[in-house]
Amino acid sequence: MTKDLHETESPARRNFIKAGMVAGVGALLTPLIVKTAQAATEAAPAAAAAAAAAGEKPKLKIGDVLRVAREKLYPICRVCPECDGVACAGEVPGMGGIGSGQAFKNNYNALNKIDLVMRTFHDVKKPDLAITLFGQKLSMPVTSAVTGGVSYNMGKKMTEEEYVISILGGCQDAGTIGWVADGIGDQMDVFERRIAVLKNTFGGRAIVTIKPKTNEEIIKRFRMVEEAGGIAVAIDIDSAGRAARAVPGQTVEPKTPKQLAELAKSTNLPFIIKGIMTVEEAKIAVDIGAKGIAVSNHGGRVLDYTPATATVLPAIADAVKGKTVILVDGAVRRGQDVLKYLAMGADACLCGRPLVRGAHGGGRDGVALMMNIIKDELTVAMTLTGVPNARNVPANVIAKVQA
């Protein structure tokens, strides 16, 4: 029997045909893609050599940085076109979100759904991105986030020293500052190596975060940071539930307000509490003397199904704005993301996973490139929303609250 051309085919037959078509196209295109990639790879050294012969430093390109990062980090990080937590869900240790990965995805999705209001009837031609953070003048309201664990989170493709130099140096070259991490599974000697780089290479110009160990162990590390000339100290209290991964004798734990007050009083450096997700705890942080808070769910890596930082930030900012420095992290991928967070009440943002890519794909220069791209995007976004400076971003920049 002849089938009518308009008769509906079975789903199974359609899927079989589609699969065949995809396979056929893939077979045709794969050699071309490989050949093109090989040609680009072979041409890169020649271009670099020509630039060197001319006395020029080869200009780093974002495509090259991402390609190298993908080669080094795969399969721990796939360097996806959109770093949204989907492909790496459940990959902890690694670069993903814990469990279902929903907390990581919440961060990305909530921020991605926020729209900006374009305004062009104004005289804002060169917006001022500069801020002062804990006495440091920064070129933009963005620092690195707290990222570490090059051995168990990043595949050990860099040494601790190389990674710290890349993050802090790249941030410095972009006119801002970075953070030094304290890994949950790190022995004391690993922390000491990071602090040595901070002191000897950067004169202490960074913020150092400590895991919520016993107060005695935290204060011991505070003294090391003070001696190194650090800008500020922090604890990432959002790591309090990860005792099973801690080094024996270096357990982590939640903290009472009394314990937090002891930490705040124990140092002459500004004390920051990272991992604030409620108005209640933001107020407590202010009361015990914290000079800064970081609204953070640890990149979605500690408690599955936590809300996005973009969801909780506005209420926290309403409660404590002006009483302490408000920092925020969570899916900062572009300059537009920074503007959104500033409009919701943050004083500055922390950028994490993109800088991990930058460090592995281009070292110090790769991190600087990532940060400068964000800076350029923020400049354009502020111009097109009529925001003259990053220190006072109005809420009506966000579409849902526009005047």
PLM region spans:
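An N-cap/entry alpha-helix motif that binds or orients negatively charged groups
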Residues: 55-139, 403
